[in-house]
Amino acid sequence: MSAGVRWKITWENDLEPSDHAELSEFFRATYGPTGAFNAKPFETGRSWAGARPERRAIAYDSKGIASHMGLLRRFIKVGDTDLLVAELGLYGVRPDLEGLGIPHSIRALAPALQELAVPFAFGTVRHAMRNHVERFCRDGISNIVTGVRVRSTLPDALPDMPSTRTEDVLVLVFPIGRPMSEWPSGSLIERNGCEL
């Protein structure tokens, strides 16, 4: 991100309706090129797609919102172990800044993650993002955990659809209060809620 970027780390309750409207427009513009389905949750002015974030890191520059990442504390189950994490998600970076956002978003959120006193932060990305996140992992801030599937509830319970989905995604783990060696082993992560 350029030097002209300012970060706003905010609690969800502190966002105004105008903030949600601006974020909704940002997500439609950011996610729309990846497929109309990806932008659909934001058509009604919502600034979240599944689970609603607890805190947000929002980068602004002279053109408006440059980048966004949300976080939500939750218990997940990794194998047989219940684990408190800060889930990171709802990530977006304006198309003209692609490739510059994730490391800056994590660094901006670092004080909030420390304040929340979670042992780990975790997030998931599509396999198509592997090269991008591998570059990011070289800094040692994050680790890619492979061979793990993630099971989540769907945002809407429909009578003719399953209530959960299991995905083969890349899992990123960020050691916050504990070393990576303490991340539990397991081939399935139960999110026990909607993806952020």
Curated annotation (Swiss-Prot):
Its EC number is 2.3.1.-. The keyword Transferase applies. It comes from the Bacteria. GO terms for cellular component: cytosol. Pfam families: NodA. GO terms for molecular function: acyltransferase activity. Keywords: Acyltransferase, Cytoplasm, Nodulation, Plasmid, Transferase. It is found in: Cytoplasm. Belongs to the NodA family. N-acyltransferase required for nodulation. Acts in the production of a small, heat-stable compound (Nod) that stimulates mitosis in various plant protoplasts. This is Nodulation protein A.
